A protein has these predicted regions:
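Short, well-ordered strand-loop elements centered on a beta-strand within folded domains, enriched
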Residues: 217-230
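Active-site-adjacent alpha-helix immediately C-terminal to a catalytic or transition-state-stabilizing loop
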Residues: 4, 62, 70-75, 144-145, ...
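Short, cationic low-complexity segments
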Residues: 229-237
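Phosphate-coordination/substrate-recognition cap region in phosphate-metabolizing enzymes
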Residues: 40-131, 137-139, 189-213, 237
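Short coil-to-beta-strand
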Residues: 2-11
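Loop-to-helix element that buttresses phosphate recognition and phosphoryl-transfer chemistry
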Residues: 11-69, 79, 142-160, 201
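A conserved hydrophobic position in a structured secondary element of the catalytic/binding core
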Residues: 7, 104, 179
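Short, well-ordered beta-to-alpha junction loops that form the rim of enzyme active sites
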Residues: 10, 55-58, 83, 114, ...
Length: 237
């Protein structure tokens, strides 16, 4: 039996400013750093030893993982995967969510954020927010870099990576993944067999480890958030 731990990065600067972030490489707020350290404290208090670490390519996820490992005093090298990046929000990138609710209506913004296969219009490649213009993504093949994505698109890349690279390692290893709200929602849809309606309602809190207990056949025995006060409804448990 083993543990799979999913951690959404701690609060980022653009989380605080209520902006659509997507692939823009913003860092953690001071509160986000505290959330990451608390995540490490909770993992340590539950006596869970991590064998393998993964994070997305994005600074907020990498720094969350760095702070967790510092608390755990664990110097293992983590594996970085762009497939675990946040969903790309296309032309919405950098815009304020509350302002967009006023401009487009709350239901339309909710559709953009939570529908399964709706993509916002693509982001102009000349934008400084476009991933092709961000140094962190120079290693990614240009034909893999999105202009916009739906949750379905995010699901396909994140879950394909999980199935191809991570899943066969979960039998004998405790694995921690530091990622993002939508890439973690995508993984939860796969792991918990959620339908499209359920996934639209799933909220992932920042910096709160979701611990999934797997049996020897990779079936889920149980799961829980370690920070009970900030836990969200898991829909299926």
């Amino acid at each position: 039996m083993s543990y799979l731990i999913l951690v959404r990065h701690g609060q980022s600067v653009w989380n605080l400013e209520k902006k659509f972030t997507g692939w823009v490489d913003v860092d953690l707020t001071e509160n986000g750093k505290l959330e990451a350290k608390k995540a490490g404290d909770l993992i340590k208090a539950n006596n869970i030893n991590i064998d393998i670490y993964y994070s997305s390519f994005q600074l907020r996820a990498k720094n969350t993982l760095k702070l967790i490992q510092e608390v755990l005093q664990d110097t293992k090298i983590s594996e970085k995967a762009w497939q675990l990046n946040e969903r790309h929000y296309g032309i919405l990138t950098g815009l304020n969510k509350e302002e967009m609710k006023i401009k487009l209506g709350e239901s339309k913004v909710h559709q953009f954020r939570r529908s399964w296969d709706l993509r916002p219009d693509p982001l102009d490649k000349k934008s400084s927010y476009h991933p092709i213009n961000i140094e962190a993504y120079k290693e990614i093949p240009i034909n893999k870099i999105p202009d916009t994505e739906s949750l379905k698109d995010t699901y396909e890349r994140a879950v394909n990576f999980y199935k191809q690279v991570i899943e066969n390692k979960t039998t004998n290893n405790n694995i921690l993944i530091s990622a993002h709200g939508n890439s973690i929602r995508a993984l939860c849809k796969y792991l918990f067999k959620l339908d499209n309606d359920q996934i639209s309602k799933l909220e992932i809190p920042t910096g709160n480890p979701l611990v999934i207990h797997l049996d020897i056949k990779n079936k889920i025995n149980s799961c829980k958030y370690l920070d009970h006060e900030r836990a969200k409804d898991l829909v299926v448990f």
